[in-house]
């Protein structure tokens, strides 16, 4: 009794496989022949499997003859119902094999679409039937199959997976070649413009994907794609390469490159859609790479040649298409960037050369020409090249090159001509005139100026000229707009930092302080003896304004009183300060009483001093005027030239050509009593030519001096931090530190090093060639 209980402790009955198999087999046959099945019949089949799996068998019957029993963890052989299933599993496997062997006979002689229709239809039916069978065998899967797999037995699968493995071995492998070839032929037909039944391909692909079972894990989720990759994708990619190699070569021989690019673009989109419609998504990247290699990379040289043609012809749409294609190739854009940089550089040089000498003295023409080139190619980079950083850099390099070195800089024999012309253009925008644009337009134009400013190498030159011109605008009160002036200084500060604009901002402050000072002086005059003329003053801090001290000058007695009253007033407010008068920048108004009409003359202080002499006499020699005004002869001659040209004064020979007459000490100059002018207010305060030239020379001289100081300061800063440095390293660091202001010339840096050695800031290291050390 005890023996019986150990073999069948719960009194379960023993069911032999033969007892259920005929009915189970008939039911499975019904499933695979797609006959309708009632739910009750399905449950009968399920119950057959369940009853068999839960019946009691001897362990050797459970496993089947010749199969060694599995060992439990304790080395014991578990017996009983746990292991019932192997015989059923083997019968199911045999059934599937026989079913597919018979099915293969119907398809093995088919080709092309016929084999695809056969394969996809049978696959769909088989897949569905196998899922039904998997449900019928659910208990077998959960218990016997799961336990076998857990114990590491190979070649045992969940029933649905077993069905797939059997399909793979018995139907897929024999038909694989003709099915894959049929799929590839169908794809080629579609590439050639024919309409195809894409469901045939997607059906095959779906089958290939699902057949990629994970052999190591019968219950693994998702396929491994091995079958799909090896049996289809590798051949598909090779086919793709052959097809497009032939097509691209033939198309390029018969059509322009622009048409080829459209074709390539269309083909790439087609292949992308192909994956979406009927291939596996994992093929996307491989297929794209293959197409890009064949359609683009192999023809890069042709693209490079065409790129230049498209630039020359301004074919922006085609350039954009080329960019989109070539950007798909790794490092493919390098050559296009170089070609673009060279092209923009050449276009910039040609545009400036076309302006000729006119641009040398016409800042507006020069800057506008530069901006036109930049605007054109900036728009190209944004629209055609997607504002790609590499193409933006090519634009920047090209603009930097042609702006700092072109026909105008060569004519001027100075690379500093560009910043000077840009500063003069700013002056023309910010100076009061009848042509001043509206505020919004002016702001937009100043933004455009900053575009050019970005590319200027010698920013210190721009700053010097800009400061000179700003100073004159402020002193002569002819700024178009204080807001625009402040806006421009703010833009420069943003671009170059506080130090770059500190003097410009100080100038503004001085003008504000001077307004308050004038109010205080007027108030002071009302409380004491008033002046008998209008008088205003600007007090400028000497370190911030780019003006030189005044030359010798004897103030006319008519102006002496104003001068003395203000000097005394200022001294009472600021006892420690000394005023230095800039007569060359001062101006005033004179009213005439000696001509037919009464005129108001707007004149410089020097002009006033000369004209006031004629209150006493009608004629003076040049020497007499020099003695009475104390103005140096070279400056006096220029002032007299302007007065002679305005016809207020005349030479003794009234018909003589003023430009051709050399003024000598004994030259007699008379007041012209027949003076006439259509205007009653006449501005005779025009700049002197030699004064402008001298100013320009002084500015350039100051720039060179300032540069030397900046270079020396940079060297000291670097050496203080590094202590010891090789010559080449020092040069490199100086160039890096100062490149945002200007490009220092190497000979000047060397000279500055020598100066600092003399001043004992540095010394040469003994025994080491070209090495310097810092002296604390």
UniProtKB/Swiss-Prot annotation:
This is Cullin-1. One of its GO terms (molecular function) is ubiquitin protein ligase binding. It comes from Homo sapiens (Human). Belongs to the cullin family. One of its GO terms (cellular component) is cullin-RING ubiquitin ligase complex. The gene is CUL1. Core component of multiple cullin-RING-based SCF (SKP1-CUL1-F-box protein) E3 ubiquitin-protein ligase complexes, which mediate the ubiquitination of proteins involved in cell cycle progression, signal transduction and transcription. SCF complexes and ARIH1 collaborate in tandem to mediate ubiquitination of target proteins. In the SCF complex, serves as a rigid scaffold that organizes the SKP1-F-box protein and RBX1 subunits. May contribute to catalysis through positioning of the substrate and the ubiquitin-conjugating enzyme. Keywords: Host-virus interaction, Isopeptide bond, Methylation, Ubl conjugation, Ubl conjugation pathway. SUPFAM superfamilies: Cullin homology domain, Cullin repeat-like, Winged helix' DNA-binding domain. GO terms for biological process: animal organ morphogenesis; cell population proliferation; G1/S transition of mitotic cell cycle; intrinsic apoptotic signaling pathway; positive regulation of canonical NF-kappaB signal transduction; proteasome-mediated ubiquitin-dependent protein catabolic process; protein K48-linked ubiquitination; protein monoubiquitination.
């Amino acid at each position: 009794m005890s023996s019986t209980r150990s073999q069948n402790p719960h009194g379960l009955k023993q069911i032999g496989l033969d007892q259920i198999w005929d009915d189970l087999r008939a039911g499975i046959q019904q499933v695979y022949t797609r006959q309708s099945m009632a739910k009750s019949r399905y449950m009968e089949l399920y119950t057959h499997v369940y009853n068999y799996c839960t019946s009691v068998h001897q362990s050797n019957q459970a496993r089947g003859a010749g199969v060694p029993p599995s060992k439990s963890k304790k080395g014991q052989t578990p017996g009983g119902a746990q292991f019932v299933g192997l015989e059923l599993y083997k019968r199911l496997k045999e059934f599937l094999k026989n079913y597919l062997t018979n099915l293969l006979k119907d398809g093995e002689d088919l080709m092309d679409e016929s084999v695809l229709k056969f394969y996809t239809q049978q696959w769909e039916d088989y897949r569905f039937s196998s899922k039904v069978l998997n449900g019928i065998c659910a208990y077998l899967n959960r218990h016997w199959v799961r336990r076998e797999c857990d114990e590491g037995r190979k070649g045992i699968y969940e029933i649905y997976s077993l069905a797939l493995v059997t399909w793979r071995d018995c139907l897929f492998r024999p038909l694989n070649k003709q099915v894959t070839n049929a799929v590839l032929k169908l794809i080629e037909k579609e590439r050639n413009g024919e309409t195809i039944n894409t469901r045939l391909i997607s059906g095959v692909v779906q089958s290939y994907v699902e057949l990629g079972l994970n052999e190591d894990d019968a219950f693994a989720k998702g396929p491994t794609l091995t079958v799909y990759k090896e049996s289809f994708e590798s051949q598909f990619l090779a086919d793709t390469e052959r097809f497009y190699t032939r097509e691209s070569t033939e198309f390029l021989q018969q059509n322009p490159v622009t048409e080829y690019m459209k074709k390539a673009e269309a083909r790439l989109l087609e292949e992308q859609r192909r994956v979406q419609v009927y291939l596996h998504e994992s093929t996307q990247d491989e297929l794209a790479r293959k197409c890009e290699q064949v359609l683009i990379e192999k023809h890069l040289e042709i693209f490079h040649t065409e790129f230049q043609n498209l630039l020359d012809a301004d074919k922006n749409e085609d350039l954009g298409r080329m960019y989109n294609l070539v950007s798909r190739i790794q490092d493919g854009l390098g050559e296009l960037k170089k070609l673009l940089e060279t092209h923009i550089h050449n276009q910039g040089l040609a545009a400036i050369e076309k302006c000729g000498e006119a641009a040398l003295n016409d800042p507006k023409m020069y800057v506008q020409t530069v901006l036109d080139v930049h605007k054109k190619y900036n728009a190209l980079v944004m629209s055609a090249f997607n504002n790609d950083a590499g193409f933006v850099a090519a634009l920047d390099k090209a603009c930097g090159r042609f702006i700092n070195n072109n026909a105008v800089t060569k004519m001027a024999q100075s690379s500093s001509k560009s910043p000077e012309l840009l500063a003069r253009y700013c002056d023309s925008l910010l100076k009061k005139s009848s042509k001043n644009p509206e505020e919004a337009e002016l702001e937009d134009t100043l933004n455009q100026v900053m575009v050019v400013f970005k590319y200027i190498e010698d920013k210190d030159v721009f700053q010097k000229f800009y400061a000179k011109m700003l100073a004159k605008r402020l002193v002569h009160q002819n700024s178009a707009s204080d807001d625009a002036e402040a806006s421009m200084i703010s833009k420069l500060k943003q671009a170059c930092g506080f130090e770059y604009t500190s003097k410009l901002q100080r100038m503004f402050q001085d003008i504000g302080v001077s307004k308050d000072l004038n109010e205080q002086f007027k108030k002071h005059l009302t409380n004491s003896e008033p002046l008998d003329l209008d008088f205003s003053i600007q007090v400028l801090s000497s370190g911030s304004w780019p003006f030189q001290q005044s030359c010798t000058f004897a103030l006319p007695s008519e102006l002496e009183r104003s001068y003395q009253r203000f000097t005394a007033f200022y001294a009472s407010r600021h006892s420690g300060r000394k005023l230095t008068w800039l007569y060359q920048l001062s101006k005033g108004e004179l009213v005439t009483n000696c001509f037919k009409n009464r005129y108001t003359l707007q004149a410089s202080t020097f002009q006033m001093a000369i004209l006031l002499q004629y209150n006493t006499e009608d004629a003076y020699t040049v020497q007499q005027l020099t003695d009475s005004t104390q103005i140096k002869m070279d400056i006096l001659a220029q002032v007299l030239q302007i007065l002679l040209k305005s016809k207020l004064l005349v030479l003794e020979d009234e018909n003589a050509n003023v430009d051709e007459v050399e003024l000598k000490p004994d030259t007699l100059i008379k007041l012209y009593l027949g003076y006439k002018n259509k205007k009653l207010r006449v501005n005779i305060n025009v700049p002197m030519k030699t004064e402008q030239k001298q100013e320009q020379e002084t500015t350039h001289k100051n720039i060179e001096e300032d540069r030397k100081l900046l270079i020396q300061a940079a060297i000291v800063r670097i050496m203080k931090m590094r202590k010891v440095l090789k010559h080449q390293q020092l040069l490199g660091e100086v160039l890096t530190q100062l490149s945002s202001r200007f490009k220092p010339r190497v000979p000047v840096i060397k000279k500055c090093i020598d100066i600092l050695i003399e001043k004992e800031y540095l010394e040469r290291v003994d025994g080491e060639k070209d090495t310097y050390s810092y002296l604390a």
